A protein has these predicted regions:
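The feature captures the beta-strand-to-loop junction immediately N-terminal to the Walker
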Residues: 42-44
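Conserved ABC ATPase "signature" region
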Residues: 106, 121-139
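Helix-to-loop junction immediately C-terminal to a conserved catalytic motif
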Residues: 57
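Conserved ABC transporter NBD signature motif
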Residues: 65-73, 82
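Conserved ABC ATPase signature
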Residues: 118, 143-147, 151
Length: 264
């Protein structure tokens, strides 16, 4: 599978806002997400990160403006066609009680044949490939509930890979994991993007993890985009203070010199 051309975009937003009665959660914003890259949505709690991600995944319709996928309004896509392009993983994962890893990953094939379609050889090949890519093929017959936190998250990501979508939307994929499993999952996401040309848009809380594993960052505060760009452009004390509202500084990492943030 060839990576997408780097000048393409997956999602673009034109003066998009989102409101609930009595409150505007996202103020009008315009931006485009680069295709084939890992993009991190960062910012304080309540800044609008998850709301924006849910709008991209068509879980929230925009109050105003237009969200486009590949230059086409998201409302114009059928459910099946949209699912063949975009896969969404919520922060609160659905129950997988009694399901094996293979059974969970196979759910990703649903957009390609539907509830009454036959699960064929091509579907099995996609499932096997997805499990192999995330390192879970030896666990195919294990119950999902018996896996560690990192393994369970990899199983859900394998389901998205089996869906064969070009864009993955991940809402805080590392929030319930310890540091070792956070690194494991983010390294996997980065590798999948680079090897398969996938666009990944993920809500992330840890700015240092986001800077290490993302190609592009979009920072929100109070429902507004206040900074965006490569991690090197965001990892400055004054920019981080503007994003998080507290004094922050930057030190070079002793191995490689990559910028690492800290709180005063």
């Amino acid at each position: 599978m060839q990576p997408q051309h780097p000048t393409e975009t997956t999602f673009s937003l034109d003066q998009v806002s989102f409101s609930v009665p009595g409150r505007m959660l996202l103020k009008p914003l315009s931006l485009a997400f680069p295709a084939g890259k890992v993009c991190g949505l960062i910012g304080h709690n309540g800044s609008g990160k998850s709301t924006l991600l849910k709008m991209l995944g068509r879980h929230h319709p925009a109050t105003s403006g237009q969200v486009r996928l590949n230059d086409r309004p998201v409302a114009d896509w059928s459910n099946k066609a949209f699912a063949r392009q975009v896969a969404y993983l919520p922060q609160q994962l659905p129950a997988a009680e009694g399901m094996t890893v293979r059974e969970l990953v196979a759910i990703g094939r649903y957009p390609w044949h539907g509830a009454l379609g036959r699960y064929g050889i091509e579907d099995r090949e996609h499932v096997d490939e997805a499990m192999a890519l995330v390192g879970l093929k030896p666990f195919a017959q294990r119950l999902v509930d018996s896996l560690s936190g990192g393994e369970r998250q990899r199983a859900w990501i394998a389901m998205l890979v089996a869906q064969n979508s070009r864009c993955l939307l991940l809402d805080e994929p590392t929030s319930a994991l310890d540091i070792a499993h956070q690194v494991e999952v983010l390294a996997l996401i980065q590798r999948l993007s680079r090897e398969r040309g996938l666009t990944v848009i993920a809500v992330l809380h840890d700015i240092n993890m986001a800077a290490r594993y993302c190609d592009h960052l979009v920072a929100l505060r109070g429902g507004e985009v206040i900074a965006q760009g490569a991690p090197q452009a965001i990892m400055h004390g004054d920019v981080l203070q503007k994003i998080y509202g507290i004094p922050m500084g930057i030190l070079p990492h002793p191995q490689g010199g990559a910028p690492v943030s800290f709180v005063y």
